[in-house]
Structures are given as structure tokens and as C-alpha cells.
């Protein structure tokens, strides 16, 4: 059996139908969530300098309209030309009270200056109305936009107002303003702020996380109530994700994250129902499908001449990864090999699914009979960290393959347990001398990062995941809601609400996995370029927003600019 045969069964053997979905016109917000605080400071690059020059301050009046802002704006001349007598004669002092010169010429441009001030208020995230608002403790740190507007330095200081829902300091995470396409159109900008749930939800949730991390309990409760009004399991991707993130924050505040996570696991649907949800996720989220595809391609290539194969699958779940590989092995020109699969699943997951590993065994037995391939299934209900060589019963003459698919991040590392079970497991596997070891993992770093950084990373990662689901399944589809609740929500809650040994969702980036595997004695086994080319073509059938990158023999699958899944092989 060669890779072409394996991929043939990947495409046709499992009755997989590829349809080009209607692209969902999701807008990518220029504002990114970030838990850091920002303060407006002395920046020569602020766009205010081009819109609010001292020599353009023709007139201001001391009317209620012009005193509606509670912000303090100070214009300080930095050159002799700007400090000349004509500038001083204007008597303009932009402090708590606005004073103007008595020259009647200034009154003629009152309307223009009112418009200029409204533009400035828009940039500073002021509310829609002209009514004075209460200042908050939030401050902006120095921000420099990507595009240089004016080289002349100005100092603009202010205390930020209580922002609109989702409009605050955190939206400046990218360190700048929109680029050249940005226009000073107050009405349009305010409408965009009101209508874009990306801005509203992300900023509200970030403020909730900040208040929680700083023990500002009263503010946290108020923000939670505000956030509940803009999240929904039926809304935009960020609104759906926000519903689960918010529950994670509430659970963390109540120290109930662990109980909620365990309850979610115990409330998993029955085996057949969960298997159905996982298959839906498998079909609408090609990351998992093509992660399996890459791993199976590496296994097929490494074992192509072997007649006695033993696959050890840590966290076998529903066993769907092996359907197409078994079909391909059964079609070998010289006859199928003997296949033995050891499926490992932790007792909690097995209990939650009812029949547990039995249903996986029944499925594999049915496939064995249908495709006439000698197949033996050995269930092993034990935590991965407790697996020993003796449990695996390695037999002489077996060509061994070990598979870690979205599982290894569940194993604690040195930050949780001084014995470092994660690296210990890899060393144990290396001691088995497998012909190939495959690893598929989420491309995220939620392992040792502090809470606020972890919250921002989780929101960014799953935002891309939820957006990609929208590209392939209608938003009002009831199955989509069930898939997100049963397959994704519990992971999100665990990352946000739990700590210590109770936080089992501890993702790491490919670079970190590479370091761990190398220290355990593994060497990279480059994935087939043919497999990668086929995956690249199939991704295009879903959406042109999917990406595939090859790095050091590994494969990275993503949505837009966000990498979501890594697949690699080792020996």
C-alpha cells in the first residue's frame, strides 16, 4: 500500500463528500483583545496631531456644547514658531476650563471647531452623546499607529471616560490605529463600534477577566451582567464563544471551575450521540480531519512493508481516525497485514460515554469483517501517565506505531508535577522503539502562561475555530450548537476556570513539542510532501481562508493568519 492508495480511501472509501461551502463574509476586526493596560502618552505618531494642530484652533466658545467633554486636553508648543505672539494672543488654554481670546474673528469658525472636537472625541472612544460622563480608572498607555501621520510632537493627556460596551483600552492590543483606510467620520465610526460584536464582546470579556484577576469583585459582577447581554450561543462566532468564556470566568470567580468541568464530562451524551457530534465536528472542521490524515500518511509510509502491525493509540476517543487507514491496509496488493490496535482511554471519559471502549471495539470488529482484514483490538482503560510497557504487551515481530492525537497536552508537565509525567511518557514510548510516533496537537500556548495572557490566547484561538465552523455550517443549525457545547465548551471552561492539576487542557506550541521529543531521543520523520499537497487542495474545497504551512517536516493548519493544529511524525 502506498500513500496514493491511502489518500484514495481518505477521499472515497469513507464516503466523504466534499462540497465547496458558501463563504461567510466574516469581518476581521482591526482591534485585538489584550489584557495589558495602555496609556495615551507623548507620541509623535498620534493621528490627533494631524487633526488638532495648534495653528488650526481658530476659535472655541465657552458654551455648554463645547464643555460637554470631561477630558483634559493640553496643547504644548514645542517650537518657537508655535510659541509666537499670535499664538499667545489667541489665549487658548485647553485645560479643565476652555478659555478663548476676545477677538471677534474667532467666533466665525465656531462650527468648524465643534466639528473638530467631535472628531477627536470619536478617536478617544467617547460616547455618542455630548453629555458629560464619569471618568474611570482605566488609562491608555503609549500607542503608536502603524502609519506615520505627522512628525511634529504633541502631548495629549486625558482620563478615559467610561467606555461604551466593549470600547476601552484593551482594543489597542495591536499597538496602533487602523492604517490608511481609517477616516475621521464620527457617525460612521460610532455605528461600527455599536454594530461590530467583535469589538463589543472581546473588550467586555477582557475587562471582566482584568477585574477578576485584580479582585475588583463589584466591578466584575457589573461587567458580567453587561456581558450577558451581548453573548449568545446562537449569535456571531465571537458571541457564541463569549458565552462559554463568560461561564468560565464566573466559574473561576466562584471557585467552581473544576466541578463544572467534571459535570460537563459526566453529562456527555451517550456513545452513539457523542460519536455523531464528533463526526460532525470532524467534517465541518477540517483541522481534525487533515491532522488525522497527516498522521495516517506517516504511519502508512513507515509501515508500508510490514505484515504484522501494532498501533498504540493514546486517548483513542471514538476511533474514527483508523477507519480510512484500515480500509487502505485491507486493499494492499499482496494482501492485508495483521493489525492490532491498543486503544487507551482514561476511566473518566470511558464512564462518561457509557459503553466506553466497547463501542470502539464493536466498530473496529465490524470493519474487520466487512473489509476482510485480520484485526485485533485491545482496550486499555487507564490514564496515560499510568501506562507501562507491560500493559502494552509488545509481541516479537510487531512493527510498532504510537499515536498521540490531541491527547499529550492532557498529561501534566514539570509545572504541575515535579516528576514531569509528560516527558516521562515520551521517554517510555521511545523505549518501545516504535517505527514511527505521530503527534497532532492544538497550536496554542495555554500551559504555563499567566491567567490574563491565557485568557487572551484562548479567546484568539477559539475565535478562529468558531469562525471556521461558521464557514461550513449554517449559524442556525441545531447540530452546530450541540457540537460546540459537547466538543468545545468543556475545554474552554477548563482552560479559563481551573488551575493546578485540575487544569488538564495545557496546550503547547510545535516548537515546545519539538524540544520535548528531541530530549526524549526522537528525531523528526518528515511528513510526505504528497500528503501535504493533497491536503492543500482539499482545504481549498472548504474555504480559501484555510491555510497550510510546512515547517521542519511538520504541518501547520490554520484559519486566516491563526495556526490552529500542528501535525508531526517522529522516530
UniProtKB/Swiss-Prot annotation:
Residue segments, region Leucine repeat II (LRII): 359-391
A UniProt-annotated Pfam family: GRAS
Region (VHIID) location: 278-343
Biased composition (Polar residues): 61-77
Xref: InterPro entries: TF_GRAS (IPR005202)
Region ranges (PFYRE): 400-494
Domain of life: Eukaryota
Disulfide bonds: none
Stretch list, region Leucine repeat I (LRI): 199-259
GO cellular component term of the entry, any: nucleus
Listed GO MF terms: DNA-binding transcription factor activity; sequence-specific DNA binding
Keywords, comma-separated and alphabetical: Nucleus, Transcription, Transcription regulation
Region listing for SAW, in residue ranges: 497-571
PROSITE patterns linked to this entry: GRAS
Induction data: By oligosaccharide elicitor (N-Acetylchitooligosaccharide) extracted from the rice blast fungus (M.grisea) cell wall. Strongest induction by chitin oligomer with greater degree of polymerization (heptamer). By inoculation of M.grisea in rice cell suspension culture.
Chief place of localization: nucleus
Record motif VHIID, residues: 309-313
Residue ranges, annotated region (Disordered): 61-80, 151-180
Gene Ontology terms describing biological process: regulation of DNA-templated transcription
Ranges of residues in domain GRAS: 192-571
Subcellular location per the Swiss-Prot or TrEMBL entry: Nucleus
Entry similarity comment: Belongs to the GRAS family.
Function: May play a regulatory role in the early step of oligosaccharide elicitor response, downstream of the membrane-associated high-affinity chitin-binding protein.
Other observations noted: Induction by oligosaccharide elicitor is independent of de novo protein synthesis.
Protein name per Swiss-Prot or TrEMBL: Chitin-inducible gibberellin-responsive protein 1
Amino acid at each position: 500500500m502506498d500513500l496514493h492508495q491511502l489518500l484514495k480511501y481518505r477521499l472515497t472509501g469513507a464516503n466523504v463528500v466534499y462540497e465547496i461551502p458558501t463563504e461567510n463574509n466574516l469581518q476581521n476586526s482591526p482591534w485585538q483583545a489584550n489584557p495589558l493596560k495602555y496609556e495615551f502618552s507623548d507620541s509623535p505618531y498620534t493621528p490627533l496631531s494631524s487633526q488638532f494642530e495648534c495653528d488650526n484652533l481658530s476659535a472655541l466658545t465657552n458654551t455648554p456644547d463645547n464643555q460637554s467633554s470631561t477630558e483634559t486636553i493640553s496643547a504644548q508648543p514645542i517650537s518657537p514658531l508655535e510659541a509666537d505672539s499670535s499664538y499667545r494672543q489667541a489665549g487658548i488654554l485647553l485645560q479643565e476650563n476652555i478659555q478663548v481670546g476676545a477677538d471677534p474673528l474667532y467666533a466665525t469658525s465656531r462650527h468648524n471647531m465643534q466639528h473638530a472636537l467631535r472628531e477627536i472625541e470619536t478617536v478617544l472612544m467617547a460616547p455618542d452623546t455630548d453629555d458629560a460622563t464619569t471618568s474611570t480608572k482605566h488609562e491608555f498607555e503609549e500607542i503608536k499607529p502603524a502609519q506615520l501621520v505627522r512628525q511634529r510632537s504633541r502631548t495629549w493627556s486625558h482620563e478615559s471616560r467610561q467606555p461604551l460596551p466593549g470600547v476601552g483600552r484593551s482594543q489597542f492590543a495591536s499597538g496602533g490605529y487602523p492604517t490608511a483606510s481609517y477616516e475621521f467620520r464620527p457617525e460612521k465610526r460610532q455605528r461600527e463600534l455599536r454594530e461590530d460584536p467583535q469589538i463589543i464582546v472581546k473588550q467586555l470579556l477582557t475587562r471582566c477577566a482584568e477585574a477578576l484577576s485584580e479582585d475588583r469583585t463589584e466591578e466584575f459582577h457589573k461587567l458580567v451582567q453587561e456581558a450577558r447581554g451581548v453573548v449568545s450561543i446562537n449569535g456571531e462566532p465571537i458571541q457564541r464563544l463569549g458565552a462559554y468564556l463568560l461561564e468560565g470566568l464566573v466559574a473561576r470567580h466562584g471557585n467552581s471551575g473544576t466541578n463544572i468541568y467534571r459535570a460537563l464530562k459526566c453529562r456527555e451524551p451517550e456513545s452513539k450521540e457523542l460519536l455523531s457530534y464528533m463526526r460532525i465536528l470532524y467534517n465541518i472542521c477540517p483541522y481534525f480531519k487533515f491532522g488525522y490524515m497527516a498522521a495516517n500518511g506517516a504511519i502508512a509510509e513507515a509501515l508500508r512493508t510490514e505484515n504484522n502491525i501494532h498501533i498504540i493509540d493514546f486517548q483513542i476517543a471514538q476511533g474514527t481516525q483508523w477507519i480510512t487507514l484500515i480500509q487502505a491496509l485491507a486493499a494492499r496488493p499482496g494482501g492485508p497485514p495483521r493489525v492490532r490496535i491498543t486503544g487507551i482511554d482514561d476511566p473518566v471519559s470511558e464512564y462518561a460515554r457509557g459503553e466506553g471502549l466497547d463501542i470502539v471495539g464493536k466498530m473496529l470488529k465490524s470493519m474487520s469483517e466487512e473489509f476482510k482484514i485480520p484485526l485485533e483490538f485491545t482496550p486499555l482503560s487507564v490514564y496515560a501517565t499510568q501506562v507501562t510497557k507491560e500493559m502494552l504487551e509488545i509481541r516479537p515481530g510487531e512493527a510498532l506505531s504510537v499515536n498521540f492525537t490531541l491527547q499529550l497536552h492532557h498529561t501534566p508537565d514539570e509545572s504541575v508535577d515535579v516528576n514531569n509525567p509528560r516527558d516521562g511518557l515520551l521517554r517510555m514510548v521511545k523505549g518501545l522503539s516504535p517505527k514511527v510516533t505521530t503527534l497532532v496537537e492544538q497550536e496554542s500556548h495555554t500551559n504555563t502562561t499567566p491567567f490574563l495572557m491565557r485568557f487572551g490566547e484562548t479567546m484568539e484561538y477559539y475565535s478562529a475555530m468558531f469562525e471556521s465552523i461558521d464557514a461550513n455550517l449554517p449559524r442556525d443549525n441545531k447540530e452546530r450548537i450541540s457540537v460546540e457545547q459537547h466538543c468545545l465548551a468543556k475545554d474552554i471552561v477548563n482552560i479559563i476556570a481551573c488551575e493546578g492539576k485540575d487544569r488538564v487542557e495545557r496546550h503547547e506550541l510545535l516548537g515546545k513539542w519539538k524540544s520535548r521529543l528531541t530530549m526524549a531521543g526522537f528525531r523528526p520523520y518528515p511528513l510526505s510532501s504528497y500528503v501535504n499537497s493533497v491536503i492543500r487542495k482539499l482545504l481549498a474545497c472548504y474555504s480559501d481562508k484555510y491555510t497550510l504551512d510546512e515547517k521542519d517536516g511538520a504541518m501547520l493548519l490554520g484559519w486566516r493568519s491563526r495556526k490552529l493544529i500542528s501535525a508531526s511524525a517522529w522516530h
